[in-house]
């Protein structure tokens, strides 16, 4: 018998690949069609965010968080604001907490809609993204009506939110909920019940409970394996302990389970949005939308026209900023992608001494090599899609 040289070959996936979900470069080592090794090359979107934050006041640093997971920006701002509030002992008014909770759930819809529909597109279905983006457009308009910006909102501020919601916007958000659930049902029938989608996703990228814990997974990646871990229930913040909602969990820990969970989470988010709208209309939901301490939030414009002190507070806030007491704190929120955390160290000045960002996508991407081994080349984009990665937060 003649001897044959068997040689694995390496190919590049990305960084311009449409299924790479950003500027990801994977070096794939293949044995025929079977993946032997995956080497993710990150850093192509690195902007030095953590270092830039050290040179800005706390208020000036907030917009940097919009640019991390730019699919659902307000969830990232939330973690930073919570960290500042815990260090400085700022009391957030109830109305501001309800508005934050409402817009965090809108962010969850924005993220899950993008992920589920582009996952369908990666396996060849072109209709779901069109339906999903139609709904995302409506949600973007809610962002715009609240903050003035569709994407980089800079709406959450230490001590509350930037401005109040007009009553008409609350009515429109509530009116959005019922028709949206119909679209989710349609997507369920079109995508989740589809034979081809199931063939491409069932039993692909299986993660057991122990493996999910060992790799530092969070969010849907953990719940897909059957662990009901959700920071909104296990470590409630803002108004989440008042809300009535369930945590969907998977059985098999595969790609398909994780997408089904994202579909269910959209329904749960709509439940929370309805409750927030109802509570915002109640007498207990009225009141200020930012801390009444003039050191942390700007005074109302009518005050500035009358009071010299208010004008001085405003000037000091936007030039020097406020000083946060010395100390360190870790604040985490249940972002759509997983546990997004901010470890904030203050030296008592008006700028953070250090701000470490814990991005869920970073922990998930490191498991790409282990999850893809033994799968076919065509399954790489399915596994990558189910990790739900955005490079703003991975590269920072």
Curated annotation (Swiss-Prot):
Topology in the membrane? Peripheral membrane protein
| Disulfide bonding pattern of the chain | none
Q: Does the keyword Chaperone apply?
A: no
The Gene Ontology CC terms held by the record are: plasma membrane
A GO molecular-function annotation: NAD binding
Q: Provide the E.C. number(s) assigned to this enzyme.
A: 7.1.1.-
Give the function comment from the record: NDH-1 shuttles electrons from NADH, via FMN and iron-sulfur (Fe-S) centers, to quinones in the respiratory chain. The immediate electron acceptor for the enzyme in this species is believed to be ubiquinone. Couples the redox reaction to proton translocation (for every two electrons transferred, four hydrogen ions are translocated across the cytoplasmic membrane), and thus conserves the redox energy in a proton gradient.
Return the protein name: NADH-quinone oxidoreductase subunit D
Tell me what organism the protein belongs to: Methylorubrum populi (strain ATCC BAA-705 / NCIMB 13946 / BJ001)
Q: What is the lineage of its organism?
A: Bacteria, Pseudomonadati, Pseudomonadota, Alphaproteobacteria, Hyphomicrobiales
Q: Which gene encodes it?
A: nuoD
């Amino acid at each position: 018998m003649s001897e044959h040289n068997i040689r694995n070959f390496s190919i590049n996936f990305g960084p311009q690949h449409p299924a790479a979900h950003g500027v990801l470069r994977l070096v794939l080592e293949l044995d025929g069609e079977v993946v032997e090794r995956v080497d993710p090359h990150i850093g192509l979107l690195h902007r030095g965010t953590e270092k830039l934050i050290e040179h800005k006041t706390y208020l000036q640093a907030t917009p940097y968080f919009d640019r991390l997971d730019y699919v659902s920006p307000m969830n990232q701002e939330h973690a930073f604001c919570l960290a500042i509030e815990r260090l400085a002992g700022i009391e957030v008014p109830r109305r501001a907490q309800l508005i934050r909770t409402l817009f965090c759930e809108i962010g969850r819809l924005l993220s899950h809609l993008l992920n589920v529909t582009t996952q369908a597109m990666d396996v060849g279905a072109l209709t779901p993204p069109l339906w999903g983006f139609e709904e995302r457009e409506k949600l973007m308009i809610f962002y715009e009506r609240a903050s003035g910006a569709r994407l980089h909102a800079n709406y959450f501020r230490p001590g509350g939110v930037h401005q109040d919601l007009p009553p008409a916007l609350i009515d429109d958000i509530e009116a959005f909920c019922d028709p949206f659930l119909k679209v989710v049902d349609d997507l369920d029938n079109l995508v989740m019940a589809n034979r081809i989608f199931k063939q491409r996703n069932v039993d692909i990228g299986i993660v057991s409970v122990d493996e999910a814990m060992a790799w530092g997974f969070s969010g849907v990646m953990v719940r897909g394996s059957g662990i009901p871990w959700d920071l909104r229930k296990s470590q409630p913040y803002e108004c989440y302990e008042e809300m009535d909602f369930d945590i969907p969990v998977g059985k098999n820990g595969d790609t398909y389970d994780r997408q089904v969970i994202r579909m269910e989470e959209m329904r749960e988010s709509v439940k929370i949005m309805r409750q927030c709208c109802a509570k915002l209309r109640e007498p207990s939901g009225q009141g200020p939308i930012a801390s009444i301490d003039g050191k942390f939030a700007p005074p109302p414009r009518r005050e500035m026209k009358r009071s010299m002190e208010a004008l001085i507070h405003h000037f000091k806030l936007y030039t020097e900023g406020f000083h946060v007491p010395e100390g360190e704190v870790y604040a985490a929120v249940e972002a759509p992608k997983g546990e997004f955390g901010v470890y904030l160290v203050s030296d008592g000045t008006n700028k953070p001494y250090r701000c470490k960002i814990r991005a869920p996508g970073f922990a998930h991407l490191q498991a790409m090599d282990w999850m893809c081994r033994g799968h076919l080349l065509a399954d790489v984009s399915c596994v990558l899609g189910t990790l739900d990665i955005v490079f703003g937060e991975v590269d920072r």
